[in-house]
């Protein structure tokens, strides 16, 4: 736009790539694997849906309590396979204490590690779940804004996590 003329009647110009071209990363670059230690990591899953509530889509992610940032995330069904994909993304990081809620698959997957199971110690990640629901309308439980495709659902939420936590 030349000068400081107002641009009435036109949409503001943004430099965002179209969502179809987005390739959001799944692991943070703020924490260096091997050199930085994650003292307390909270893990949780968050429910969403694509098209209809019967087509559930789960966001699994790990949250660093001290740095207040998401470490890694994956999308999928609420199964051991999805949790396994998240754990493989987290394997390069040195995590001292894992904190989760009472979902039984966490217990079996974190066997042999220092693991605290308590709703009290997952308050921060639960608050982060609420922040995600407030910031992204498509994660709302009762909303007219829902994702129409799995690809767009994953890219929009992944892009949000990239902007807020990974860069």
Curated annotation (Swiss-Prot):
User: Any S-S bridges, and between which cysteines?
Assistant: none
| UniProt xrefs under Pfam families | DDE_Tnp_IS1
Name the GO terms of the biological process aspect: DNA transposition
Keyword terms of this UniProt record:
DNA recombination, Transposable element, Transposition
Q: Does the keyword Disulfide bond apply?
A: no
Recorded hits in InterPro entries, A to Z, give: Transposase_27 (IPR005063), Transposase_27_IS1 (IPR051354)
Question: What's the family?
Answer: Belongs to the transposase 27 family.
How is this protein named in the record?
Insertion element IS1 2 protein InsB
Q: What is the phylogenetic placement of the source species in the record? A: Bacteria, Pseudomonadati, Pseudomonadota, Gammaproteobacteria, Enterobacterales
Q: Which gene encodes it?
A: insB2
């Amino acid at each position: 736009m030349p000068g400081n003329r107002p641009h009435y009647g036109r949409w503001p110009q943004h430099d965002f790539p179209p969502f179809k071209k987005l390739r959001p990363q799944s692991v943070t670059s703020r924490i260096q694997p091997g050199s930085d230690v994650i003292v307390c990591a909270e893990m949780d899953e968050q429910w969403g849906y694509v098209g209809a509530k019967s087509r559930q889509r789960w966001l699994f992610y790990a949250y660093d309590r001290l740095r207040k940032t998401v470490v890694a995330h994956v999308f999928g069904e609420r199964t051991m396979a999805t949790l396994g994909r998240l754990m493989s993304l987290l394997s390069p990081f040195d995590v001292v204490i894992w904190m989760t809620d009472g979902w039984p698959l966490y217990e079996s997957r974190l066997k042999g590690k220092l693991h605290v199971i308590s709703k009290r110690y997952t308050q921060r990640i639960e608050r982060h779940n609420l922040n995600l629901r407030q910031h992204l309308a498509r994660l709302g439980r009762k909303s007219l804004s829902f994702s129409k495709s799995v690809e767009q659902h994953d890219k929009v939420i992944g892009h949000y996590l990239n902007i807020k936590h990974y860069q």
